[in-house]
Amino acid sequence: MRIHPTAIVEDGAQLHDSVTVGPYSIIESGAVIGEGCRIESNVRIFGVTRMGAHNRVCHGATLGSEPQDLSFTPEKARPLIIGDHNHFKECVNISGGIKSEGGTRIGSHNYWMAFSHAGHDCVVGDHNVFANTATLAGHVEIDDHCFLSGQVAVHQFCRIGSYVMIAGVTGVPQDVPPYMLADGHRARLIGLNVVGLRRNGFGQEQRTRIKQVYRLILRSGLRLDDALQRAEDEYPGPETKRIVAFIRASRRGIVSFG
């Protein structure tokens, strides 16, 4: 273990022997940091944080900080659970939980660019990219393989489905279903995330099926329940199943199309 002499590692913090801690960083009692993690300079890791292996935390980042919620009191604190192989760039802030027993949960292989933020009780999957200053309000859920561009702001309790791309400076007030592109001052669906799907190995047949499913759901004029059922019947497959399940589970509704 390599700990810079100016760093503060409180008694009760649990660090794997292979962890490195840079100058002026603070790791509070109760924090758990797994194998191969690299903590750079001026980082603060709060005691509610539980971190897996091979994460990199860059200058000025804060992980597990107090939720930005006026109702917060220390006895309400819930954990921040982080998986493996995440990269937190400069001044990233991830809050601990407050209102859900599981707390704030970050999966694995996520890339958080400078000044990006996840609020309390967010649940983030794997292989996502959050560009500079992308912001998730409390209780937001992000699935897998999403790309949120710079200055995207997601309203609390919204859900973002897998393989979604959201354009820069977009405000997201409702759920964004899987495989889609969203853009606008208030997000609107503008088409399929074709580039993202190609990069993740989706073939032409899969992309065509996804497009057919969304054309049916968004443009057929059918009642939503009827359109979802018809999509399942006419275009069976894992992509259809993911889309239909996501929309049926929506509490805030889906962002508009076009």
From Swiss-Prot:
**Entries under InterPro entries matching the protein:** Acetyltransf_C, Acetyltransf_C_sf, Hexapep, Lipid_A_LpxA, Trimer_LpxA-like_sf
In which broad location class does this protein mainly occur, judging by the first location in its UniProt entry?
A: cytoplasm
**Pathway entry:** Glycolipid biosynthesis; lipid IV(A) biosynthesis; lipid IV(A) from (3R)-3-hydroxytetradecanoyl-[acyl-carrier-protein] and UDP-N-acetyl-alpha-D-glucosamine: step 1/6
Q: What class of enzyme is it?
A: transferase
Catalyzed reactions per annotation? a (3R)-hydroxyacyl-[ACP] + UDP-N-acetyl-alpha-D-glucosamine = a UDP-3-O-[(3R)-3-hydroxyacyl]-N-acetyl-alpha-D-glucosamine + holo-[ACP]
An example GO CC term for this entry is: membrane
Q: Cite the entry's keywords alphabetically.
A: Acyltransferase, Cytoplasm, Lipid A biosynthesis, Lipid biosynthesis, Lipid metabolism, Repeat, Transferase
> Could you confirm whether the keyword Lipid biosynthesis appears in this record?
yes
First and last residue of the signal peptide? none
The EC number on file is 2.3.1.129
Q: Where's it found, cell-wise?
A: Cytoplasm
According to its UniProt entry, the protein's GO biological process terms are: lipid A biosynthetic process
GO terms for MF: acyl-[acyl-carrier-protein]-UDP-N-acetylglucosamine O-acyltransferase activity
Q: What does this protein do?
A: Involved in the biosynthesis of lipid A, a phosphorylated glycolipid that anchors the lipopolysaccharide to the outer membrane of the cell.
PANTHER family (alphabetical): ACYL-[ACYL-CARRIER-PROTEIN]--UDP-N-ACETYLGLUCOSAMINE O-ACYLTRANSFERASE (PTHR43480), ACYL-[ACYL-CARRIER-PROTEIN]--UDP-N-ACETYLGLUCOSAMINE O-ACYLTRANSFERASE, MITOCHONDRIAL-RELATED (PTHR43480:SF1)
Subunit and partners: Homotrimer.
The family assignment reads: Belongs to the transferase hexapeptide repeat family. LpxA subfamily.
Q: What is this protein called?
A: Acyl-[acyl-carrier-protein]--UDP-N-acetylglucosamine O-acyltransferase
